[in-house]
Amino acid sequence: MFREHIGWIKECHDLGLKVNVWTVNSLEDMQWCIDRGVDYITTDEPERLQELLRSQRSFHDVTGFLPVYGKLRDCKNPLYSRLSSDMQPTVRKALWNLSQNTAGLYVRFRTNSTSVGARWTVKYNNQFNHITATAVKGLDLYCLQDGKWQFVNSAIPTGKENHVTIVKNMLPQEREFMLYLPLYDGIDKLEIGIDPGAEIVASELNSPDRENPIVMYGTSILQGASAS
């Protein structure tokens, strides 16, 4: 019941009120409360809650921390737009609207964390009958192995606000990662989650090579989502 209305916790905090949620016994509900800053969680499973609290990741907002690649040109305004704001008056409205979908945009980072998670808020929360939610507004994580980018896993969305563990139980060593953003939706906020005490920095490798970009233009047949 308490998960039906997302905004009520923020409204309470804005009024200076503390939030206590009672009888939270499932791990999913516990995580939901933690993600939204519930002040007090009352549960019949205190050991499970303590274990979950110990396993929480340290989240890092991409804004001002990691570059966003895959744009027409390097621009920071808006951060998750494929076109810069100075182009908005000169392009068709339909084209500008499509540019707010983050298709082809990605961030790269290096970390020694044994797990990688993500918290992200999509712009529109689009839903289609013929395409899975993962294809519409999910994330795809790749890792650089022996000079090649290997697919790791997808972050499956649940709605407008999402919190997903993408990969865990890796050996504690430094790795290069690339995270692709949603295809048919935009991003309002994106945070990368790593182990407490682990390090995360922007990648210094020029991979994929951005010196001579190839621009591909076409229908859904080109990108494969709705080819039929």
Cite the ranges covered by each PLM segment:
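Catalytic nucleophile-elbow at a beta strand-turn-alpha helix junction centered on a G-D-S/GDSL motif
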Residues: 211-228
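N-terminal secretory targeting modules
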Residues: 54-213
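Glycine-centered flexibility sites
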Residues: 37-40, 104, 218, 224
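Short loop-to-alpha-helix "cap/lid" segments that border enzyme active sites
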Residues: 1-53
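Flexible, glycine-rich phosphate/dinucleotide-binding loops
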Residues: 28-30, 148, 223
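Residue-level signal for short, function-critical loop segments
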Residues: 25, 124, 220
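Short beta-strand/turn micro-motifs composed of small residues
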Residues: 23, 181, 218
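Glycine-rich nucleotide phosphate-binding loop and flanking beta-alpha elements
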Residues: 48-49, 124, 223
